[in-house]
Amino acid sequence: MTRVDIAYSASQLARFMTNPGPSHFKAAIRVLVYLRDTAARALVMRPDPVRGLESFVDSSWATKFSCSGGMFFYYGCLFHWFSKMQRSVTLSSAEAEFFGAMLAAKEVIFIRELLIDLGFIIDAASVIKCDSKSAVGMAFDPVAFKKTKHILRAAEFLRDLVAREVVSVEHLPGAVMLADILTKAASRAVFVELIKQLDTFA
């Protein structure tokens, strides 16, 4: 998949590949029409040596399995992303966001090791940006884990990475959360604005 702007749509459609209905076919046609109308778009790399490995992660809380999305940048260039359903049931939006941060952290670990193998020097914590202050607090506060025993392993995994300064979880206002387009069907205005903020397409 080479278009981050259709990642959420493609992920949702893939869930119904074994038993698609008329509504899914109609949605797939809309995606194809969008791709036709934006065929000239491409990923643009504008390296910024000041920026290291950073990621943006968001989750949309659902009554059962939430959807998480993440974007990963190196030197300010988008090179990897995901949009997928969580495998664990979370009991609040904060837990869903925290679990999304854990998924992003797993990707970051793999990416860091890959970059090191390629000869890059990674000597600073990789930043994971999340739009939930509660989720950020859970990554630093041991007391918070008493309320999250059902996702204890994920909590311990992420907190260990934070303690070892492998990753750093930071809050980012929802209005500028780029990963929002990977977790829900945004309105046209919001979608267009986030794509502009992404500053990756040309």
Regions found by a protein language model. Name each.
Residues 24, 36, 65, 104-107, ...:
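Active-site-proximal structural scaffolding
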Residues 16, 52, 84-202:
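RNase H-like nuclease module associated with reverse transcription
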Residues 1-8, 60-69, 93-110:
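Conserved pre-motif C helix in the palm subdomain of viral-like polymerases
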Residues 37-41, 62, 78-80, 110, ...:
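Conserved helix-loop functional segments at active or binding sites
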Residues 33-59, 120-122:
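Structured nucleic-acid-interacting core domains from mobile-element enzymes and related host factors
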Residues 6, 40-42, 52-54, 69-71, ...:
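Conserved active-site beta-strand-loop modules that form the wall/rim of enzyme catalytic pockets
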Residues 1-41, 173, 181-183:
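C-terminal reverse transcriptase regions that engage the nucleic-acid substrate
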Residues 55-94:
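RNase H-like nuclease fold core
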